[in-house]
Amino acid sequence: MNVFSYLLDPAHWTGPQGIPMRLAEHVYYTALTLLFALVIAVPIGAWIGHTGRGGFLVVGLANGLRALPTLGLLVLIVGATGLGLIGPITALVILAVPPILAGTYAGLRNVDPAVVDAARGMGMRGREVLLGVELPNALPLIISGIRSSVLQVISTATIAAYVALGGLGRFIIDGLAVRDFPQMIAGSLLVAMLAVAADLLLAGLQKLVVSPGLRAAPGPRRLRVVPSKTPDAAHAA
């Protein structure tokens, strides 16, 4: 049986071990990981980027976490927590945080200081500047970090199969156990296709949420103030 025969076999598209179920499990692991990573990385990156304090920590932390071997980290966490979802998700979150953290920090630090000064001159307070000016103008780099994180998580979520969980990694691990190479290659192709589909989806989302001016003219010198209808701003105007 070759790879295409394996993928086209109706028996592999039904049941709890079929391709749709494994795909849904893989997407679930990825979405759960991304949710935790966003909750952790975006506020920290935004605060550091806004205040300018601790930037060296972002660089050091991002590089340090990226250097950790995910599989080795998974073994350590599973040894402490036991089998289950906690180990793989924790390992994947540690992998997913650095790109988002670095993208958020870099995005805010690249906002033109003149734009921020203009916003403050309009009477906007610190939080209003962060939410109404800096974060919207930092979206291109933030979303780029998210895209990088998602690709890494999708490709690495196959480690969940090492601790008896599901996902597309089951095709690779189970195929390796019985030397079923078509199954292993099919699993790898499915992971790659999912990664490409997710990246295209996020690219489309980026076009929707990022203003055309920021897409056409990236760079701090062309960033703009996002209009804000705050009472202080209206009064200052």
Regions of interest found by a model, annotated:
Residues M21-T30, V78-P99, L139, Q183, ...:
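Loop-to-helix entry region at the N-terminal start of transmembrane alpha-helices
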